[in-house]
């Protein structure tokens, strides 16, 4: 078994043996966009409008989400330049706080919040695919059985989701270059698809948004703003995935910080422009509570052809998002196995394809099982609290590593230190506290799930 780093502040010594350093800055920037842009931007604004019916405040929420994500990217970029290794955030937590906290991060990510996200996005892909192939709809039940927990059903959409995951696993199995090519093509396609909405709005819009600070029917704007931020943060999640693939970047110390900053800045700009197009396509009354807001906006601007175009864009977007997720998630599993806290076989690299093939298969099989179980959404909700908490703790690593390892080279230092890391920590802390107050059951469940990882860690360490 490979030796594992022991105490905080020790430099990682285990190399990413066998992996191919094939990714440059352009690929890394597109990876940030590809891993973050899934279905959120197409679905969340209508839900936000139901609690915050003001175009100005909704745009402020999206801008605030961009500032939070950018402060996170700037903060983690320093640690990324110090430890340009596969595993990303897992490695930073290990070096700053020790192996147990790093293990708990990987435990939560791989078992629930990341694999559950893959399952949810895959089912979303199948749901939109049913727009052009109705027989693949989630409402078409193929099999059902009674269980002690209730009736377990498997729909056509769940089967399509499993096929989607398997296809992407195969693409990433045969090489990081093939996975990267797919990501580049699909990310460019989804960004072009999103760009069509503002262009249509410029040409065909007949709605003039009410750019007032607060609408008259918003009795508690601050409370509504906080609720809306949950949707924004979800749509901005996964910015950190690019750190997990550092072991396959050609010059990660230079390019990884740049990719985080450029990618998140572009993402924020895209989200703001697309939301502005929604407000020019539909009056606020028609936006409120609408789930498929992009589809409805496109219909208002270009009729049924617009709706079909959006459906195609979402299909491309969700497929591409999961391609990036499988590519990145397997590297986290690989890093944990390399450190001896997961099955050692997952640290193997394919002799021909130079990919962590066992890790790719393991992640994809587990995500497929979650998709078939139908319970991923509930589990995902429970553990997102723990995910936000761990990323907040990870940001403290910048301060801790400056004290523990002042001698370690830092090709990039956080711009605006210490203000920028503090902004992310305070924003994350507010979100964690709000979730704890508003959703105590889910928050406690997330903490309990993390606690279950402690005996698993000690068992893996004793092997």
Locate each region found by the language model.
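Hydrophobic alpha-helical segments and their helix-loop junctions in multi-pass secondary transporters
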Residues: 126-135, 188-215, 233, 276-282, ...
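Hydrophobic alpha-helical segments of multi-pass membrane transport proteins
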Residues: 194-197, 333, 383-410, 427-430, ...
